[in-house]
């Protein structure tokens, strides 16, 4: 219950002088703050107050003494005034106030006026009483005086626990020894008003800290409290600090972020989240919008609703200031980030420029070396030009010029390689080469100049060319040198050369074949040599010409090879014409034809023999007369001399047709006239010895001789009971057995040879892998039949590589071989291909 109604005046207003004695019952902020304060002033209720409450009487005359030294104000006593003449001096009054201040306990009035309960004020005529208990002062002064002459129990207990007098307390005697010194303040001013109040002991135990640092720290602390919470909360605000390294890391990350798309940067955005419509012209402008509240909206309306005491009002809100501060912070961060990027850019630029400086220095040194080398090269070239002047004192020779070019190539290779060697050679070397070969006779001394030209080939020829052809004239100095300087001498010599005198020309080209370019050699053979040979073959007559044609055609085979094939057809034609009236008794035909056997293909050679030689041999063998008593063997010898020239099958065919029928007929007639079997045996063995093993191994020849043995055995067996030459039957049986055994041994030996050949071939095939495709099979068959199988360089048909199989041109497509016909390509079998190639 409030007592405010007791202190109202007649008009119902409270008296201002009575505010100090008014006490409200509501809970104030001071009550909340001093709820747990043990030093707050408490009012102890007496028994009378507890009984009568607010109606308890106050007896000012019988008030009990209090420790405060003051009595409660007696408002019933008359008002006393202090005379001005009796007023104490300033010094005495100050002393009394000091004593009062020292003795006055902490009361509620010492706290701020707005924090404690308001008391009833007294008028200016009232003074607080300074009286205390009447008899308590002296008693307190003598309290504990018995300790002056004896030791207390505490001292004894400490000594029992190990205390040593003169040392500090604690396990390690870390306590203080001397009591804390006190220093009396000079006046009544505040702390620090009269200078430092620290004692000597305090200065020793706690050295003086830097006052400026303390002041700065205190200033920063107070500065952070410039906006104070009106609720009285002492909670310190939390600050987040960003270091420079964090800002640098943030800047490095932001550089990696992708830039917004250009399409989105031009989009019109209408913001209707506020009180009014706002228009932005890009999404990036939305991020720059600050959180300033709309005008006209009360601050209280923007705060979230809270209940009771938790509803706290902010001290004051300054969104513009916060926005400006945020802008300053962001600008500072951007400046730091930009400075870091600029610093990194400058560092990178320094590194880049240092590298460029090093590279530039290297380039400069290289250019200086190049300039020095070029000046030396220029000096050598100028020396060559000076010595090439006509009527000079020291004319330049081809060997000396080669040594100068070798110096250029060895010491100044880069400059020599990059220089235009063609122009340099044309200006210097060509005149010297012309002068060197002006008296040259190639057919007399074919190797003249090969050494010096070989040296110039290594100096002038460009090894980087992919193809060496006539198109290299503009880029290769050596090819141009040989074509423009050396080739005219060769043309003059070939124009005066006789093809029948082939050896000097062949030796000359053999000497220069490895020096001159390939295309120049091909040009010589195709355009100069072959036309001369073709013309000479057309003029050759085998019947009247005493010089065999092979003597001046075949020496060109190593150089020209397949280029000579167009000459073979007219040669065969002329030889066929010459053999029309030939008789086997003329051995010159064999001498003329024998060199051509290895040149012509097996098929063409066999065809030539069957057309021109075999019929003549058959006629000769048909004229042979077999007479056991008087045998003329000339015709037989003429035929058998051609055994190596014609094939075994052709020779066996001649024997089967023209020899064995007559020979068996003579044998039968001889056996029917009581012959001498010993003579028949000798005659049989004599004729058999006239044939070579290759002919005897032929099955047809074996059959004929076995037939003769059978005839002899039948003749011996059929004459049983008649007169028989003693031992004839045994001799014929022995002869038959011997011949059969020889045939068996020969067949066994042939089989063994074939097995060995197959074994060796199998080892070779296993070592070189079995043919896995049709092309490998054709190549294997070509090797077995001694047929040339090789690709035609630069020739294709429908993207397929062309090959030469003997004289036939073929190509392979998906396991099928195609042969070139008259108008189209015809597929054929492998065996037919082999027969056609032969």
From Swiss-Prot:
Q: Which domain of life is it from?
A: Eukaryota
What residue spans carry the region label Required for nuclear speckle localization? Answer: 711-735
Point to the regions of Acidic residues compositional bias: 14-29, 92-101
Query: What ranges does the record list as Basic and acidic residues composition bias?
Result: 1-13, 45-65, 102-117, 218-232
The principal localisation class reads cytoplasm
Could you tell me where this protein is found in the cell?
Answer: Cytoplasm; Nucleus
Q: Which SMART domains does the entry link to?
A: G_patch
The Swiss-Prot or TrEMBL record annotates one GO molecular function as: nucleic acid binding
Found, by tissue, as follows: Widely expressed. In tooth it is expressed in ameloblasts and odontoblasts.
The protein's matches in InterPro entries, at most eight in alphabetical order, are given as: G_patch_dom, GCFC_dom, STIP/TFIP11_N, TFP11, TFP11/STIP/Ntr1
Asked if the record carries the keyword Phosphoprotein, the reply is yes
- Keyword field: Biomineralization, Cytoplasm, mRNA processing, mRNA splicing, Nucleus, Phosphoprotein, Spliceosome
Region labeled Disordered — which residues? 1-74, 86-137, 193-237
Where are the annotated segments for Required for interaction with DHX15?
1-51
Give all residue intervals belonging to the G-patch domain.
150-196
Per the Swiss-Prot or TrEMBL annotation, the motif Nuclear localization signal is positioned at 701-706
Quaternary structure? Identified in the spliceosome C complex. Found in the Intron Large (IL) complex, a post-mRNA release spliceosomal complex containing the excised intron, U2, U5 and U6 snRNPs, and splicing factors. Interacts with TUFT1. Interacts with DHX15; indicative for a recruitment of DHX15 to the IL complex. Interacts with GCFC2.
Q: Can you tell me which family this protein belongs to?
A: Belongs to the TFP11/STIP family.
> Which protein are we looking at?
Tuftelin-interacting protein 11
The organism named in the record is Mus musculus
């Amino acid at each position: 219950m409030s007592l405010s109604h007791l202190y109202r005046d007649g008009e119902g207003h409270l008296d201002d002088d009575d505010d100090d004695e008014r006490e409200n019952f509501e809970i104030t902020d001071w009550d909340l703050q001093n709820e747990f304060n043990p030093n707050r002033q408490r009012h102890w209720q007496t028994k009378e107050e507890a009984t009568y409450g607010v109606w308890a009487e106050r007896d000012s005359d019988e008030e009990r003494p209090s420790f405060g030294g003051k009595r409660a104000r007696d408002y019933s006593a008359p008002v006393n005034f202090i005379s001005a003449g009796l007023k104490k001096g300033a010094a005495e009054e100050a002393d009394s106030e000091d004593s009062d201040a020292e003795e006055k306990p902490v009361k509620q009035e010492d706290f701020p006026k707005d924090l404690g309960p308001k008391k009833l004020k007294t008028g200016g005529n009232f003074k607080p009483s300074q009286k205390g208990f009447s008899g308590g002062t002296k008693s307190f002064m003598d309290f504990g005086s018995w300790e002056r002459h004896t030791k207390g129990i505490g001292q004894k207990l400490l000594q029992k626990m190990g205390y040593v007098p003169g040392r500090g307390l604690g396990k390690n005697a870390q306590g203080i020894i001397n009591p804390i010194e006190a220093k009396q303040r000079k006046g009544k001013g505040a702390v620090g008003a009269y200078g430092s109040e620290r004692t000597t002991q305090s200065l020793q135990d706690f050295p003086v800290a830097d006052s400026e640092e303390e002041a700065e720290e205190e200033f920063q602390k107070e500065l952070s409290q410039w906006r104070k919470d009106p609720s009285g909360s002492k909670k310190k605000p939390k600050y987040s600090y960003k270091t420079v390294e964090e800002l640098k890391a943030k800047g490095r990350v932001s550089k990696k972020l992708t830039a917004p798309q250009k399409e989105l940067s031009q989009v019109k955005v209408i913001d209707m989240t506020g009180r009014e419509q706002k228009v932005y012209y890009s999404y990036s402008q939305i991020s720059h919008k600050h959180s300033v509240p709309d005008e006209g909206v009360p601050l209280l309306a923007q705060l979230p609703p809270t209940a009771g005491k938790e509803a706290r009002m902010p001290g004051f809100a300054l969104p513009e200031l916060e926005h400006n501060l945020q802008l300053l912070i962001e600008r500072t961060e951007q400046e730091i980030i930009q400075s870091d990027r600029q610093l990194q850019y400058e560092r990178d630029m320094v590194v880049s420029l240092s590298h460029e400086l090093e590279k530039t220095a290297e380039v400069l040194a290289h250019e200086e070396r190049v300039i020095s080398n070029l000046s030396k090269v220029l000096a050598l070239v100028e020396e060559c030009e000076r010595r090439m002047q006509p009527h000079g004192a020291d004319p330049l020779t081809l060997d000396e010029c080669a040594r100068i070019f070798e110096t250029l190539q060895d010491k100044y290779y880069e400059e020599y390689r990059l220089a235009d060697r063609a122009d340099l050679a044309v200006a210097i070397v060509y005149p010297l080469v012309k002068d060197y070969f002006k008296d040259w006779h190639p057919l007399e001394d074919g190797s003249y100049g090969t050494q010096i030209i070989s040296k110039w080939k290594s100096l002038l020829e460009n090894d980087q060319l992919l193809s060496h052809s006539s198109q290299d004239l503009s880029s290769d100095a050596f090819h141009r040198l040989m074509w423009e300087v050396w080739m005219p001498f060769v043309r003059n010599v070939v124009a005066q050369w006789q093809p029948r005198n082939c050896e000097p020309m062949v030796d000359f080209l053999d000497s220069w074949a490895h020096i001159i370019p390939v295309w120049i050699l091909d040009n010589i053979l195709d355009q100069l040599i072959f036309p001369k040979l073709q013309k000479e073959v057309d003029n050759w007559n085998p019947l009247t010409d005493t010089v065999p044609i092979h003597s001046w055609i075949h020496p060109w085979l190593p150089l020209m090879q397949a280029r000579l094939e167009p000459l073979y057809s007219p040669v065969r034609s002329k030889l066929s014409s010459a053999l029309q009236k030939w008789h086997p008794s003329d051995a010159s035909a064999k001498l003329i034809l024998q060199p051509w056997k290895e040149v012509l293909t097996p098929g063409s050679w066999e065809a030539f023999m069957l057309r021109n030689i075999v019929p003549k041999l058959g006629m000769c063998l048909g004229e042979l007369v077999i007479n056991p008593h008087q045998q003329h063997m000339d015709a037989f010898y003429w035929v058998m001399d051609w055994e190596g020239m014609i094939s075994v099958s052709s020779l066996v065919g001649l024997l089967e047709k023209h020899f064995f029928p007559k020979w068996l007929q003579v044998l039968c007639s001889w056996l029917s006239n009581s012959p001498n079997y010993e003579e028949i045996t000798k005659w049989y063995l004599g004729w058999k010895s006239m044939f070579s093993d290759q002919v005897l191994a032929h099955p047809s020849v074996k059959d004929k001789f076995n037939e003769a043995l059978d005839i002899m055995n039948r003749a011996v067996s059929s004459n049983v009971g008649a007169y028989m030459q003693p031992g004839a039957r045994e001799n014929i049986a022995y002869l038959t057995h011997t011949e059969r055994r020889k045939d068996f041994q020969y067949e066994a030996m042939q089989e063994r040879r074939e097995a060995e050949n197959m074994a060796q071939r199998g080892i070779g095939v296993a070592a070189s892998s079995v043919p896995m495709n049709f092309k490998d099979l054709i190549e294997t068959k070509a090797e077995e039949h001694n047929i040339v199988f090789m690709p035609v360089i630069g020739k294709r048909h429908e993207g397929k590589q062309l090959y030469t199989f003997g004289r036939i041109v073929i190509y392979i497509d998906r396991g099928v071989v195609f042969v070139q016909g008259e108008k189209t390509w015809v597929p054929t079998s492998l065996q037919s291909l082999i027969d056609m190639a032969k």
